[in-house]
Amino acid sequence: MGWQRLGAAALQVIDRYVDDGVIMSFSRHISRRRKPDVDTLIRGVCAGQRSHLAMAITLVESRAPKHRRLAHELMQRILPHTGGALRVGLTGVPGAGKSTFIEALGMSLCAQGKKVAVLAVDPSSSIHGGSILGDKTRMEDLARHANAFIRPSPSGNSLGGVTARTREALLLCEAAGYDVVLVETVGVGQSETEVRTMTDFFLLLQIAGAGDELQGIKKGVIELADAIVVNKADGDNQRKAELAKVEYSRILNFLHSFTPGWQPQALSCSALEGDGIDHVWALVLKFRDEMTASGVFERRRREQNVDWFHALLQQAVMQRFTESNRERIQALEDAVGRGEVPVSMALSELLP
């Protein structure tokens, strides 16, 4: 059967049995042949077909002008179908067991009949390499589950780009009917702040004895967290993990909560053994219920939409200004590099 004759039944088979990473490359292949239109993508996404969801995300990630027009149309029409998922951001120090934790939590939620999407964000990596794809291959069981979808989110060299593309991917996952969207960041750089601005609940995963308590405070990551979970609380490490949980609880009591009306808590778990995962999720649900009742939940989402608008506005203005003044900027850049013009004077010439 030729690619152009590939029907809905075949797509459903692929959707069920093929890992989403394969679907990504598959979708790129057939997009050159079949070129599904926006109507087809919307129908497929809203029907919960992972193959169409992967193609839709690939479209919104594209920087090609012809694709951006289609992406804008797609997002505009998909918007009424979004907003129904619980958005959870997750970060942690290297070696904290993020992949194991996400898989344990995801499999637990899938067992409850929930649909779970995982978006992995790494500003230091591209979609073709780095720790994202390594994490993804360690979540094989979750990636194969019919109720799960795992997608690395490329970043290029711009944190603003990370925010824009990941937000759009998140909305597409909601339109596809996913109940929970987990947005993972590797725990380095400024990506935690970016992910915090697009999620409802932000979870910091730690391990005992890593010496990261004060380092975390310096980075400002702990202040962003709605909960700290000490992972690997098993075997000989269980006592150290419990002591670390007590220490983090003490630290949290002295810090200002990022979420008004919520006192962040510290928990412990063993993602490897599956112990404590249910307690973590129960805390997330408690947060959702309390913040919904107080109005903080809805207010935060409105504020996040406005913040997103301003971030994209700044990015668009900067891009348009750079494109329209490319030669002038290059000349001043060369002069600054040679030490002929002070940086402040170069800026004043560009922005009189």
Task: Report residues per predicted region.
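Nucleotide-state-sensitive switch-loop elements of NTP-binding domains
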Residues: 37-85, 96, 105-191, 198-205, ...
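Hydrophobic positions on the alpha1 helix immediately C-terminal to the Walker A/P-loop
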Residues: 101
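P-loop (Walker A) phosphate-binding loop of NTP-binding proteins
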Residues: 93
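Non-catalytic terminal/linker segments enriched in charged/polar, low-complexity residues
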Residues: 3-80, 330-331, 347-352
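Conserved C-terminal guanine-recognition region of P-loop GTPase G domains, centered on the G4
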Residues: 189-197, 210-258
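Long, well-ordered amphipathic alpha-helical subdomains in the mid-to-C-terminal portions
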Residues: 53-55, 268, 279-352
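Hydrophobic anchor at the beta1->P-loop junction of P-loop NTPases
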Residues: 88-90
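Canonical P-loop GTPase G-domain recognition
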Residues: 234-288
